[in-house]
Structure formats: structure tokens, C-alpha cells
Curated annotation (Swiss-Prot):
Positions where N6-methyllysine occurs in the chain: 3, 30, 316, 390
InterPro entries per the UniProt record, alphabetical: EFTu-like_2, G_TR_CS, GTP-eEF1A_C, P-loop_NTPase, T_Tr_GTP-bd_dom, TRAFAC_GTPase_members, Transl_B-barrel_sf, Transl_elong_EF1A/Init_IF2_C
Lineage: Eukaryota, Fungi, Dikarya, Ascomycota, Taphrinomycotina
Protein name: Elongation factor 1-alpha-B
Modified residues (N6,N6,N6-trimethyllysine): 79
Length: 460
């Protein structure tokens, strides 16, 4: 088999009509996890329904419909392979909870693929002032997705026009520059997600197209197709050298074993024998064993979803939203308040001090109060526009002091990114997103230290 391929997550963004589904469907269909049987089944249905031209989007529509009906479809269906990577496509936007998912980070994207509809008027609609495209690109950038690929889709509907492609590249470059990306590091690929041009094989319909290029630290990288552009994503550094942070998703009580917290390692490493602290619960204990997919591990690494057995801790002591860390290496703590840069996305009214919506940060789901609006800032440059504003509204960005209604554990984005970004939820939608700048931490009072931890500590 040789060396296992690296794993990367991509998020596909773009206007609803840009052909996102067709393009994503095409990659998954040609390089991916959909087995032949499923495809044959879909093709048969498509033909029966008179969709015989078998749009790739049909594959994706089927997957989406199944997901929305709550049938958990095999996540493999959202995967495809490039020569270098196993790629997972993160929930395509347009889906209600997309923003929340992107922030609470079931999976942080390593790269965003922006799909632009090349047809007349489409491109303009997607990038207009209120366009979703702008919002998604800005969100991706704010939340730390620093690599971008632009696919100019539907080139077949433009008569494979070089002029149209160049016009879109120029406009899009300006647009992404305003968001914060450097266009020189971004491959621009003219494709037809429907006909397959430049998706996997180089096109024969655009003799003028010389290929894409992008600047990287290692020099200029060149290629022709979208698949090659995805293959040229720089591998993410997985933060194993940082102190452990593992937000709990659930805590189980398992007969004969005991208490088993479950969650995804965000930073650092968890190993059997480690003395860990749970914040804000203030419980310290020893890790007896660590396992993933029912196999025991010597170590759980960033990105691993693990269960681990802890000694002398009741299920009542710790819960979802708590964060587990190494008691001897920057242990996690609860916080009294934190300062964050908040971007208001869609709130019907005005937000002023005292507003108390629910925050989703990693696995925690807790009401927090906007205690003070410190300053209103320009959302692109971060420069101050107004000191102590009375209120902020949709489209504004501000620095705010937030106070959680009950103990919670968060971190500054620059220290531990996955624990430093949050979604503000109200009226069943994401009204704002935030990035935490600084945290006022609280040392636990009379913390519970289990006998196992004391014993293990004495041994060392």
C-alpha cells in the first residue's frame, strides 16, 4: 500500500446557482466514495424521472435528501481522493447549520473552494454587495481558513470564452483581496462541472488556457485541473506539540469499565497514565486507557475522536462542553469573561450591552451576555471606527466583553484556535460569529482531585 495518504478537509462555497452541487458531485462521482451500485441505482432513477442527462448534482441531491431526512448516510460518500490526499467535503453551505458547523468545528477546513458561476449575470449576482459568496468567503477567512481555490464554473455556457474568464479572474481577485486572501496564492481554474472540462482531465475546449499557478513558500506551483489544484493544497500542521485540549462531546457510564468521556482531540496528545484536568468542572484524575473505534491506542492525536476511561469520576462530575487537558502543562480553566471580535451577520434589530444569546463554542452551548461594547471596528482591517458604541447591527463588527451565564472553558483564538471561535445563536439562526482575543481565567476553588490522581502523582 505504501504510505497512507494525508487527510484534508475542504469546504465548498459559492452562490446557490454557481453549480456547487454539480461540481462537488462530479469529483465525488469520479474520484470518490460512491460505489458503483449506488451510482447505477441513481442513474436508473434519473433516467426514469426523465433526468436522463444524469446531472452530477443528482448524486448530491440524493445524498442531501437522505441526510436531511436524518438518515445518516455513510460519510464516505462525501469523500474523494487525489493522488496525494484523502479529501473530505465539509457540509456544503446553504445548509442552515453550515455556519454553526463550520465554527463549532466538527471539522476545520484546510482549504475553501470558491465556485463562481461563469454565466452572464450569475457571477455578478454572487458577488454583489449582499451576495452570500462574500459572506462565506469572509467567514472562512475569519475562521482561519487561509488557503483558497477558485473554480470558474459553467465555462460551457460562455462559449468557452477567454475574455469572460479573464474578466471574472480580475473581479474575483479584487473581491478576495478585500476579504483578506492574497490572489497570487490562489489557483483560478476554468471548469465545466457538468461536462467535466478541467475537473480531472485537462480540457480540449479552451486552447487558450495555459494552466493555473500559485505562489507558495516553496516557490511557484503550476497545474491544469481542479483536481491538481486540490492536490497542491499545503498540508496543515497538526498541533501535536501544543498542550492537550479535548472538548467533551459526551460522557458515558459503561458497566464494568466506569466513566468514559468522548471527544475530539483538538491540540496536543492524550495518553494512558496522564493526569488530566477537566475545566470548568475542576476535576483532576488519571487516564486509564484511550481508545478509538473500539481499539486501544497508545496516544490520541489531533483530529482523533477518542473515548477514554477515567478513574473515580462520576458521570455527574463532568459533562459535554467541559474541556480536558494535561494537569501539568497549561491545564484548562474556567473563565469569568472574555473579549472577542464579533461580526454581526443577520440580526433583525440592534445589539447593545445586556444582550444574552446562546454561544456555541467547541462543544459548549451556553448563554453569554454582551457585557460591554468596547469599540466598533472595520470588519476587514480591524481598525477602530467608534469608541464604546451604543449598539451594533447587521454588517457591523465590534470588540465586546462577554460574560458567560455559567462556568465555561474557552481560549484565545491565537492560542487554541478550535476553542477560540464561536457562533452566536438566536431565533434559531446564527446571528453573529466571533473570535476570542483574550480570556479572564478563573483558578478553580476547592477542586476535586481523585485518589487515583494523587496516587499517580506520588509515583512520579
Amino acid at each position: 500500500m505504501g504510505k497512507e495518504k494525508g487527510h484534508i478537509n475542504v469546504v465548498v462555497i459559492g452562490h446557490v446557482d454557481s453549480g456547487k452541487s454539480t461540481t462537488t458531485g462530479h469529483l465525488i462521482y469520479k474520484c470518490g466514495g460512491i460505489d458503483k451500485r449506488t451510482i447505477e441505482k441513481f442513474e436508473k432513477e434519473a433516467t426514469e424521472l426523465g433526468k436522463g442527462s444524469f446531472k452530477y448534482a443528482w448524486v448530491l441531491d440524493k445524498l442531501k435528501a437522505e441526510r436531511e431526512r436524518g438518515i445518516t448516510i455513510d460519510i464516505a460518500l462525501w469523500k474523494f481522493e487525489t493522488p496525494k490526499y484523502n479529501v473530505t467535503v465539509i457540509d456544503a453551505p446553504g445548509h442552515r447549520d453550515f455556519i454553526k458547523n463550520m465554527i463549532t468545528g466538527t471539522s476545520q477546513a484546510d482549504c475553501a473552494i470558491l465556485i463562481i458561476g461563469g454565466g452572464t449575470g450569475e457571477f455578478e449576482a454572487g458577488i454583489s454587495k449582499d451576495g452570500q459568496t462574500r459572506e462565506h468567503a469572509l467567514l472562512a477567512y475569519t475562521l482561519g481558513v487561509k488557503q483558497l481555490i477558485v473554480a470558474v464554473n459553467k465555462m460551457d455556457t460562455t462559449g468557452w470564452s477567454q475574455a469572460r474568464f479573464e474578466e471574472i479572474v480580475k473581479e474575483t481577485s479584487n473581491f478576495i483581496k478585500k476579504v483578506g486572501f492574497n490572489p497570487k496564492t490562489v489557483p483560478f481554474v476554468p471548469v465545466s462541472g457538468f461536462q467535466g472540462d478541467n475537473m480531472i482531465e485537462p480540457t480540449t475546449n479552451m486552447p487558450w488556457y495555459q494552466g493555473w499557478q500559485k505562489e507558495t513558500k516553496a516557490g511557484v506551483v503550476k497545474g491544469k485541473t481542479l483536481l491538481e489544484a486540490i492536490d497542491s493544497i499545503e498540508p496543515p500542521a497538526r498541533p501535536t506539540d501544543k498542550p492537550l485540549r479535548l472538548p467533551l462531546q459526551d460522557v458515558y457510564k459503561i458497566g464494568g469499565i466506569g466513566t468514559v468521556p468522548v471527544g475530539r482531540v483538538e491540540t496536543g496528545v492524550i495518553k494512558p497514565g496522564m493526569i488530566v484536568t477537566f475545566a470548568p468542572a475542576g476535576v483532576t484524575t488519571e487516564v486509564k486507557s484511550v481508545e478509538m473505534h473500539h481499539e486501544s491506542l497508545d496516544a490520541g492525536l489531533p483530529g482523533d475522536n477518542v473515548g477514554f476511561n477515567v478513574k473515580n469520576v462520576s458521570v455527574k462530575d463532568i459533562r459535554r462542553g467541559n474541556v480536558c487537558g494535561d494537569s501539568k502543562n497549561d491545564p484548562p480553566m474556567g473563565c469569568a469573561s472574555f473579549t472577542a471580535q464579533v461580526i454581526i451577520l443577520n440580526h433583525p434589530g440592534q445589539i447593545s450591552a445586556g444582550y444574552s444569546p446562546v454561544l456555541d463554542c467547541h462543544t459548549a452551548h451556553i448563554a453569554c451576555k454582551f457585557a460591554e461594547l468596547i469599540e466598533k471596528i472595520d470588519r476587514r482591517s480591524g481598525k477602530k471606527i467608534e469608541e464604546s458604541p451604543k449598539f451594533v447591527k447587521s454588517g457591523d463588527a465590534c470588540i465586546a466583553k462577554m460574560v458567560p451565564s455559567k462556568p465555561m472553558c474557552v481560549e484565545a483564538f491565537t492560542d487554541y484556535a478550535p476553542l477560540g471561535r464561536f457562533a452566536v445563536r438566536d431565533m434559531r439562526q446564527t446571528v453573529a460569529v466571533g473570535v476570542i482575543k483574550a480570556v479572564e481565567k478563573v483558578a478553580p476553588g476547592a477542586a476535586k482531585v481523585t485518589k487515583a490522581a494523587v496516587k499517580a502523582g506520588a509515583k512520579k
